[in-house]
Amino acid sequence: MLIQINTDKNIEGHSRMNEFFSEEIKKELARFDDKITRIEVHLGDENGDKFGKHDKKCMIEARMEKKNPIAVTAHSDTPEKAFYEAVEKIKRSLSTTLEKMREH
């Protein structure tokens, strides 16, 4: 599973943060490891320099072989909170998608 972490110009994306988020993705999505080919994480601040509640956004896209990508988005006060909310959403979406695949 290839993991890509992307940030916009308003979120400082240093290597320690990228490593941390990559490890969290690996840990949280381990049970889907054989199904997922790539995960993309996009972190951003929708208000830029201005302060706003829930203006940090995390979009996670999971790509599976021969399937359409699954994408989820979460907003929160901090990039970390948005990330964890998006991880929970993508886990639920992947579980639902794989359950439907098994039923057919």
Show where each model-derived region lies:
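N-terminal, polar/charged subdomain of small-to-medium soluble alpha/beta proteins
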Residues: 1-104
